[in-house]
Curated annotation (Swiss-Prot):
It comes from the Bacteria. It is found in: Cell inner membrane. One of its GO terms (cellular component) is proton-transporting ATP synthase complex. Its main location: membrane. It comes from Aromatoleum aromaticum (strain DSM 19018 / LMG 30748 / EbN1). The chain crosses the membrane at residues 7-27. F-type ATPases have 2 components, F(1) - the catalytic core - and F(0) - the membrane proton channel. F(1) has five subunits: alpha(3), beta(3), gamma(1), delta(1), epsilon(1). F(0) has three main subunits: a(1), b(2) and c(10-14). The alpha and beta chains form an alternating ring which encloses part of the gamma chain. F(1) is attached to F(0) by a central stalk formed by the gamma and epsilon chains, while a peripheral stalk is formed by the delta and b chains. Keywords: ATP synthesis, Cell inner membrane, Cell membrane, CF(0), Hydrogen ion transport, Ion transport, Membrane, Transmembrane, Transmembrane helix, Transport. F(1)F(0) ATP synthase produces ATP from ADP in the presence of a proton or sodium gradient. F-type ATPases consist of two structural domains, F(1) containing the extramembraneous catalytic core and F(0) containing the membrane proton channel, linked together by a central stalk and a peripheral stalk. During catalysis, ATP synthesis in the catalytic domain of F(1) is coupled via a rotary mechanism of the central stalk subunits to proton translocation. Belongs to the ATPase B chain family. One of its GO terms (molecular function) is proton-transporting ATPase activity, rotational mechanism. It is a single-pass membrane protein. HAMAP family: ATP_synth_b_bprime. This is ATP synthase subunit b.
């Protein structure tokens, strides 16, 4: 019976130990496990939220980059258009200045040609008068008259 009494005593001690454990030890352990499980769940939820926020931020960045590229393309096209307009205006201004200079040069050349013609007319008239004077001063002789006309001809050339 010693064995039975020992067994019963061990059973009583075991149940007392189990009861003390269930009453005083088990609740803090369960509480700590529940808190740890809650922290893990909160951490996973925060990680999922952060992942979703990261995905949303990446989409926003992609959209902003696309908008920036489009804006840069528009700015570039506008700058090219302004440069082309500036070049066209400069070419038109240069063509106008060249045409104006050409007209002025042609007018000047025309005026110079007119002055040269008038000077030539004056010289021809003077030579004709001088030739007529020489002819009239000398006797009218066919040979002398022909020589004078030949001299006049060479002077005019």
């Amino acid at each position: 019976m010693n064995l039975n009494a020992t067994l019963i005593a061990q059973l009583v001690v075991f149940f007392i130990l189990a009861w003390v454990t269930m009453k005083f030890v088990w609740p803090p352990i369960v509480k700590a496990l529940d808190e740890r499980a809650k922290k893990i769940a909160d951490g996973l939820a925060a990680a999922d939220k952060a992942k979703a926020d990261l995905s949303l931020a990446e989409k926003k960045v992609v959209d902003e980059l696309r908008k920036a590229r489009e804006s840069a393309g528009d700015v570039r096209a506008s700058a090219e258009k302004q440069a082309a307009k500036f070049l066209d205006d400069a070419r038109a201004e240069a063509a106008r200045i060249i045409a104006q200079a050409r007209e002025a040069a042609e007018a000047e050349a025309g005026t110079a040609a007119q002055r040269a013609k008038e000077a030539l007319r004056d010289q021809v008239a003077h030579l004709a008068v001088a030739g007529a004077e020489k002819i009239l001063r000398r006797e009218i002789n066919a040979q002398v008259h022909a020589d004078l006309l030949a001299n006049l001809k060479t002077e005019l050339q």
